[in-house]
Amino acid sequence: MALKTFKPYTKSTRATVVVDKSSLWKGSSYKPLTRGQNVTGGRNNAGRITSRHMGGGSKHKFRIIDFFRKKKDIIATVDRIEYDPNRTAYIALVTYTDNEKSYIICPQELKVGDKIQAGKNAEIKIGNSLELKDIPPGTSIHNVELIPGNGGKLARSAGSSITLSGYDGDYAILKLSSGETRKVNSACIGTIGVVSNPDQKNIKIGKAGRNRWRGKRPQTRGVAMNPVDHPHGGGEGKTSGGRSPVSPWGQSAKGLKTRRPQRSDKLIITRRKKRRR
């Protein structure tokens, strides 16, 4: 996929860069695997805001994705590749030899008409899904399970992938795109290839209205609020906050580790890279 720019008829079109989706399926989604979804606007059942800066946006129907690759040792044919408004990756509609259809995360270089398979008998080929112990080291994989039978959890967004580094007993050693190296049970399932739509990281929104279409509302700075609303609020004239950056509830917003200790910590070999701040 290529990037698409626009002639500068307006200030917003001058800045806008989007992904060219002209090669994707132009019809509607497959109805038996599609359902409606309610938009909460960031409110809970009491009507109170629990997630700020959410609301509005275009209506989307939810596509039911098979993260488990349940149909083992049955060959499937790729019918079409579609845009999914609920995720950055593209999805592929596949038909199995028993005429059952399902949506899967579409990897790069997967084309309409390709044959894919899941299970022990599958080849090491893009789109095929196998247990990690059956995949050779150095292979790029995506949609990887953390617990056997729980469905793919890792590397599902556009352009992401995991490198299978090797094995240590009953565990496979994975190098994640974040820089983290961790062990995962080698009976977990992963899919060969890199997730589609790698140009997603290069898009430019261009104007505030496009964020509103996506259901994102404006974000007010803490220093522009009153002291009753934010720790940085108040002051005479323009002030810089007077303290280290914090959230509206007083929690440090710069570098504080918020992940609680878990039993799975012992499986993490190397932590992810620190962001530059």
Annotate each PLM feature.
Residues 86, 94-96:
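Structural recognition of beta-strand segments within beta-rich domains
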Residues 96-99, 177-178:
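Short acidic-glycine loop/turn motifs at beta-strand connectors
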Residues 92-93, 172:
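Short, hydrophobic/aromatic-rich beta-strand segments within well-structured domains
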Residues 96, 106, 166:
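Conserved strand-loop elements at the edges of beta-sheets that form or border functional pockets
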Residues 99-111:
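Beta-strand/loop nucleic-acid-binding surfaces
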Residues 89-92, 103-105, 128-129:
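Short, conserved acidic/polar surface loops in the N-terminal third of protein domains
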Residues 1-87, 112-277:
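Basic, glycine/proline-rich low-complexity segments that contact nucleic acids
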